[in-house]
Amino acid sequence: LDETQATLLNAGRYHASHGLLRIELRHQLRDSGHGVREDLLEAVLTVRNASDRPQRVEIGFGTSLRPGGAGGAQQVYLPLSAAGLFGDGRFAALGVRGFLKDCNQPVAAGEFACHYLEPMASQPAERETRALLLAPVVDVFDSRQPWRVALFTPSDEPARFSAVTRTPLFGGPGGADKAGQTTWRASRCVTVAAGSAHTQRCWLLLHEGDAAVAWRAFQQFAHREEFDVPGWVREMKVHYYDFLSSAEGGEGRRGDGYEGDLPRFREFRVGLATQHGYYPAIGDFIQPDRKTWQAMRGDKRGAAAMSFGKMRARIQATRAAGAKAAIYMHAALFDDAAPCFDRLRECVQVDASGQRMDFGWTGPDTAGKTWRASLGSAEWRAHLLQQAGWIMDILRPDAIVMDETFAGLGYDHHAGRTGPTSAGAIDFYRRLRALVRSFGADKAFFTSDCSMSPFVLWADGECGDHAYPGLLGQALYTQAPVRYLAALGGKPWRPCAWHFQQMWPAQMKLARQVGAGVGVSNGWLEYTGLTRLPAETKAAMLADIQTLFDARG
């Protein structure tokens, strides 16, 4: 808003009117639990609309508090999406080519802006950002000073954070201060319905230490955890992922690789085993009346026969081997060879030019062309929830692993649902977790954010495949404090890794650094599985895996 249209409130002026809007600001000091009493200030702004029509309002919280005083060199540590590390084209609509990579950024004269969730979700006129955040937290510091200032907002609401620095024409006393005044602001636009009210919160934290301190405060005060993470999820360290592999390796016919690796589960201390590639067409994973089917219909060696019986037998054998069993789903991939595609074709996401968005995946599990379905579509969300319900009811696994959950970030230009998709995605992941948990308190739902989105906030942990040179292989990916921990919090990180041998040193580095697990796999990119590993490689891996359990003890 133009400053002439703004209504400013502070500790001395805590209520006001703006036309037919009634505005009230309340502050409360809190103890974040980090050893400094009353180090957290919570601000609550309530806007009441007394008019007879909806009102669009921009709500912002600002502070000129800065570490190090007016003459300090200000920096900010941001939990940036890792999509910028390799320019992931799936984030093109958000401006991925210009994404910042280093979480540590200087704050210079002018405006520095960053966004949590899609920019348009907090500021309707903005489409792209240079800094896409994994959590709505900015941590401001001066490297010469111990104290930091952090701003954060609720986990399920979009936010735009900005710093405006104005350099004065003249310095301070003696000409020493020419750094100018910096104001940090957290804001978003909301529509307040006629006769209703909207409440917005923001927190200001003073702390020592690094940004991880602010992230923990965010998790404690600005995020509501709806379920406890099952104990077994924290205990397991090794995640096995099977892409309906072959027991004969890369040149064999798919379908029996899982059974070939099962006898090695105890030896490798596998704690979770995920079945992937089992479906006839991605997006149409399971149907109650389809008890047998052909999977991997795009594989050059021929399709693989699958059935409920085979999947259940794998689940039982996995448990007998001391592991938990998970079933794969995907948040957005939709194969137009699926019988349900014609009924659900309007669920496909539409880009800014009005074209349906293809996902660009062609693999052994595809029978037709793959499209990007939209989590902004209520019909698609209902379809996936129904699929998940059938999986849990018919197969009775211990968990569902949802692939590429970051597909929930973006814009859908389909008529009738135009706008950001993250609100629908958050609602969907919340409902999916609740559905899975309805089958037992020990059932779990895992995301695959791959450090590119924040949806693990509404899951039991992260199982995404990040074992690529462009992600896990980048030094900035594990820059301390590791960016994804802002969203992950204290939940388990148990990745998938198709490049599990190639990326093993990087996997172990992260595991030792932050307590993550490691991934082993079969059926994609590497085809040895657990059974055909070279003896020297196997021995080294087993020794490394043992250290993960030794460290835990």
Region locations from a protein language model:
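Beta-strand-rich recognition/accessory modules
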Residues: 37, 50, 60-62, 111-234, ...
